[in-house]
Amino acid sequence: MNKRFLPALAAICMSSRLVFASAASPATVVEKSPWGDVTVELPAIPAQQFPIDAYSNDVNAAMAACAAAGGGHVVVPKGTWLSEGPVKFRSNCALELADGAVLEFSDDPKDYLPVVHTTWEGSECMNYSPLVYAYGCTNVAIVGSGELRPRLKTWKAWQKRPPAHQAMTAELYHWMSTNAPVAARDVTQREGNFRPHLIQFNRSNRILLRGFRINGSPFWTTHLYLSRNVLMEGVDSYAHGHNNDGVDVEMTQDVIVRDCRFDQGDDGVVLKSGRNQDGWRLATPTRNVVVRDCELVDGHGLLVVGSEMSGGVENVYMHHCKATGKNVYRMMYLKTNERRGGFMRRIAMEDCTAKNVRLAAFEIATDVLYQWAKLPTYEVRLTEIDDIVMRNCTIESAQRRDKISGDPRRPVGRVTLENVRVVSSRP
């Protein structure tokens, strides 16, 4: 199917260019952490432009021409445009959303076929394509001050997770637990209703996300998966549906998230590394992540690790962030269960604030299974939890300062709560 962009309003926009370093010597961004510098290599992308209105409003045609010419910027001009299908990245290309540009996405599931190699809550599968999808790409970016805006009617209906979805979830769990080939794990069959991600960078390197706005998401909003060298800055993310995390960093290394605003229906910044057998098979920890100067306007957790973290999560540092909403459940939350294995270690939050926290400001839970609790345990592997720090944080109100529910078979290791102050308690 030819995926085209249908302009409701259009005007050619000559926005300022963002010129990247050369491929021979990529520019870098460095942030400090307690465990050493985190260095991110930036993408090297030529400045030449490929406006989509020069390619019959077809962003993928513009992307193909851009890649064939050695790379550049695929520009979505000012106006409202409809994508009837996914944007599929090529290496050395940037998607530039010009000032005043709104890129809408259809909500017809057939537009996101054929299936692609993706994930569902930590399990690899073949599913509808993410709306913006990069697989195996190098030097890619989404930049500009425009907006990504998916239509959500179908995806909202799918949030109800009917019996057919629950049955397919159980089947995917069995496939994963028995190491079935990923190519055979097609979850689009029998009305499984597995919603696609909005943005997924899968097995990619040198990724820049800068300055644009997100307005809604079918599922996880921005998913960084099995990738390296990611800078996400100045992104304004709004999505208030089910499972609408702000950014999920999964089995991804060398990541900086800064100066972003998250207004979410689920967690804000989430660190993951695969579910059970898939996490063990891929064996790629999420590592070397710095998050600073971000705001969680609304959402369940400011910094959350898990529960899908079987490949391990380590060397994570959040500082000078704030949770300003009234419906934040926790500031820092580490969650796992007896099926996960893996590790959570060297994770720190410093100099952060929150207005209202509905539950505990800091929590560790080792028995989190959600809807998967009714499914069988194929193998017990306990999680190492050690060197966890929360320091110099102030919460205006919370039910309690901290709650730690460890597993006596593998007790929680070192936890430091230093100068963590709850001004007033709430029921």
Regions found by a protein language model. Name each.
Residues 99-100, 138-147, 205-215, 228-239, ...:
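Right-handed parallel beta-helix
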